[in-house]
UniProtKB/Swiss-Prot annotation:
Name used for this protein in its record: Heterogeneous nuclear rnp K-like protein 2
Lineage: Eukaryota, Fungi, Dikarya, Ascomycota, Saccharomycotina
Record keyword Mitochondrion present: no
BP term (GO), one: regulation of translation
Cellular location(s): Cytoplasm; Cytoplasm, P-body; Nucleus; Chromosome, Telomere
Domain spans labelled KH: 17-81, 139-204, 248-316
Membrane spanning residue stretches: none
Functional summary from the UniProt entry: RNA-binding protein involved in the correct localization of transcripts in the cell. RNA localization is a widespread mechanism for achieving localized protein synthesis. Involved in structural and functional organization of telomeric chromatin and regulates silencing at the HMR locus.
Organism of this sequence: Vanderwaltozyma polyspora (strain ATCC 22028 / DSM 70294 / BCRC 21397 / CBS 2163 / NBRC 10782 / NRRL Y-8283 / UCD 57-17) (Kluyveromyces polysporus)
Length: 336
């Protein structure tokens, strides 16, 4: 990067005003707010940003964090938010969230949500991948809301830009194919340390500021689903279904990208037979333009009979276990 490019980027990061939006679970929101709003106020004061979290709505499982300021200040503020989420202190008596003291705040990242967009797709790396236990503890996932135009700019031509961001900043990223309900916004999931996320957000916001014009794309707003909207999807590994007004049941099974082909089968024959046998509809999430083998794809099971959903879920998981074991045995045989 030339001196002039560096100067231009520095000017952009300090002068341009941007707004960053994150999708949060209720527990994440409560932890960020802190007792009587002390934590979010500290982020606001330390970084000279306007930051707030959308109102909590009854029967709604998500909230939106909105942060506005210079690119540098906003990116640093989100880095501080990551540090709050990584901290192990327990939220108590939060007037805004009405959450009771609960050790579950210490395992936010491991929680499974009924609302599918809250579930992270990038699995946390293993110690073997990171090679440092302390660094592993500092890795976190966040969900950044981006419009279609912004997402296209971030991905770049043939995915070149997102590849460069991943390599240069030491993060992992994946963009969802689906837009959030009643909106034109998608999720950009970012995984890394707080510092790495801060740096990559500076790059991302500079790209958006320089290349994306203001559009009329509809922003996502947390809301309770209407009667004619799809039923909430169950993501719990032990099933417990969601029941809609027309008696429709849904469940989600996440399959690692490396195993999707085997689960679907040649020309889709294996998944077709599973659909037929279980009498369910199984919708497979489209493959993202940039995805690693350890990322996961969503298999959504739908039926008006809960037993059929449970059967299909059980069969999918069994097929995955069988394929994992088969590959393990092949590796052992080849290395023998």
């Amino acid at each position: 990067m030339s001196d002039s490019d560096s100067e231009n980027k520095q000017t952009t990061t300090t002068a341009t005003s941007v707004t960053q939006r994150l999708l949060l679970s209720l527990k994440e929101a409560a932890k960020i707010i802190g007792t009587k709003g002390t934590k979010i106020q500290k982020v606001r004061d330390d970084n000279n940003v306007k930051i707030g979290i959308s109102e909590r709505k009854e029967r709604c499982s998500d909230r939106i964090l909105i942060c506005t300021g210079s690119i540098e200040d906003v990116s640093n503020a989100i880095g501080d938010i990551c540090e709050i989420l990584l901290s192990e202190d327990v939220v108590t008596n939060d007037e805004d969230s009405n959450e009771k003291e609960n050790d579950e705040y210490n395992s936010i990242e491991d929680e499974k949500f009924v609302y599918p967009f809250l579930n992270f797709r990038l699995a946390k790396p293993t110690l073997d991948e990171v090679n440092d236990a302390e660094t592993l503890k500092k890795i976190i996932n966040i969900r950044v809301l981006v419009t279609r135009a912004q997402c296209s700019a971030i991905i770049g031509t043939k995915g070149d830009r997102i590849k460069s961001l991943i390599e240069n900043r030491g993060v992992r990223m994946i963009a969802s194919n689906q837009t959030l309900p009643d909106s034109d916004e998608r999720l950009l999931e970012i995984q890394g340390t707080s510092m790495a996320i801060t740096k990559v957000l500076e790059d991302i916001n500079a790209v958006i500021s320089n290349e994306v014009r203001a559009t009329r794309e509809k922003r996502y707003v947390p809301h309770v689903r209407r009667r004619n909207q799809p039923v909430s999807t169950n993501t719990s590994s032990n099933t417990g279904s969601s029941k809609s007004f027309d008696e429709e049941f849904k469940s989600i099974v996440k399959i690692p990208e490396a195993y999707v082909g085997a689960i679907v089968g040649r020309q889709g024959n294996r998944i077709a037979n599973l659909r037929k046998y279980s009498k369910t509809k199984i919708v497979i999430e489209k493959r993202a333009s940039e995805v690693s083998d350890d990322a996961e794809r969503i298999f959504e099971i739908i039926s008006n009979d809960i037993k059929n959903v449970e059967l299909a879920e059980s069969m999918l998981k069994k097929n995955l276990e069988t394929e994992i074991q088969r590959r393990k045995e092949m590796e052992e045989t080849e290395s023998a």
